[in-house]
């Protein structure tokens, strides 16, 4: 089996990012981004998706976190697109429900080749530890646009904003794991009647 790994560098006037990914990893993660809450959430993707992630980012954090969060999403999306290749033999679809105390979230993903995001998270607070939680919409939009996936995110209940977000990212990791997993019964076939994704 060919290695499903990727390394992406993305440099703009706002951020300089290096990201490496291994879709068939063990959940190892290393981050040097400068936004601790984002790093905590990315760790959920790695550990629950069994995806190795290594991300370094130097961003214009003196302004705010916006460019860093969005551009990390873009770069991770690009890395996924490279690592997954032609998509032959993958399950394509993934979904997960994840609870954390009072919070419950559902994430459904399709490696369809068609970018689309539906994200419904009724945050109970605007910030967690000084982090603007609205920025996660930018992270996921960046990911979707560059991984070329359809992604539905729903927080079904929750009163603690940290729990709401953490269940989203854990479910996202688990849905990714399911979708990118190779299906022996597919025997390298394209998971689409069109023959292309």
From Swiss-Prot:
UniProt pathway: Amino-acid biosynthesis; L-histidine biosynthesis; L-histidine from 5-phospho-alpha-D-ribose 1-diphosphate: step 6/9
GO aspect biological process, one term: L-histidine biosynthetic process
Family: Belongs to the imidazoleglycerol-phosphate dehydratase family.
SUPFAM superfamilies found in the cross-reference section: Ribosomal protein S5 domain 2-like
Subcellular location: Cytoplasm
GO molecular function: imidazoleglycerol-phosphate dehydratase activity
Protein name: Imidazoleglycerol-phosphate dehydratase
Keyword annotations of the record: Amino-acid biosynthesis, Cytoplasm, Histidine biosynthesis, Lyase
EC primary class: lyase
InterPro entries tied to this protein: IGPD_sf, ImidazoleglycerolP_deHydtase, ImidazoleglycerP_deHydtase_CS, Ribosomal_Su5_D2-typ_SF
Amino-acid biosynthesis recorded as keyword: yes
Catalytic activity as recorded in UniProt: D-erythro-1-(imidazol-4-yl)glycerol 3-phosphate = 3-(imidazol-4-yl)-2-oxopropyl phosphate + H2O
UniProt GO cellular component terms: cytoplasm
One Pfam match: IGPD
EC id: 4.2.1.19
Gene name of the record: hisB
Species of provenance: Pseudomonas syringae pv. tomato (strain ATCC BAA-871 / DC3000)
